[in-house]
């Protein structure tokens, strides 16, 4: 009973009905000439997304579903995880066509920046052997990924390839 109450309280506190907009948010997802500050926040957010995913990969304790797909393809093909993430993103963008989804600048940059950050940063991150440190690394990765997603969504310059597929 108490647990049920606490869960409802938690959900009510952390539930957003729409993505917030800030002074630097784009007025339109298909804006082809966003403010420089909006573009900077978008790029910063996408770098954080890539870094968060990389930290999760390096922890070897579990990753997001799309990254599992990229990892599996990486193992089977011998390509890097970043390259397979890029290939998956392009394939997912092709699935937007029947949905009549339109990519924004954020969509294109997401397709490019996240895989590049994964490939550039992965060689520098440790893979902890102790489960305690793996869990700590996962927590850090999830927090960084969440912050990155927040920045890129608030920039409002188009969804990432996977987001657009799921919301289209």
Language model: regions and residue ranges:
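Core subunits and conserved enzymes of cellular information-processing
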Residues: 2-168
